[in-house]
Amino acid sequence: MYGLWLSRQAEYRNEIHMKPPEFLDVDPRLLHLPTTRPSGADPVKLQRQIARYGSSTEGMPPIFVYRGSDGELVIFDGVTRATRMAKLRPGDLVRVEVVGELRAPCRQLPTVGDRLP
């Protein structure tokens, strides 16, 4: 019983000391594509998002990214949103949330701008 109490106290302390989220405003064309989506956004899903939301960013959740060891950002969640913003609002910045760090560099991965339709 005492051990269970100690483990819960340790969990509580870890929750308090979590790193605060890091938000950045970046050009979506410069974000690197994940290895699971090297060709970019799914064209059907992209057209569906364009038809539904157009160039609006209202209510759009942040794009989740990881920071590579070289400082480059690679998309974890939001390839279609990033592509839509890069295509319809070139030069505008989008909000991303850095959710973690990678040990490997990401510079060799293609960017959203490289794969714009």
What are these regions, as identified by a protein language model?
Residues 17-76, 86-87:
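Short alpha-helix boundary/capping and kink motifs at helix termini
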Residues 1-23, 32-44, 109-117:
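An acidic, glycine-rich, mixed-charge low-complexity segment common to nucleic-acid enzymes
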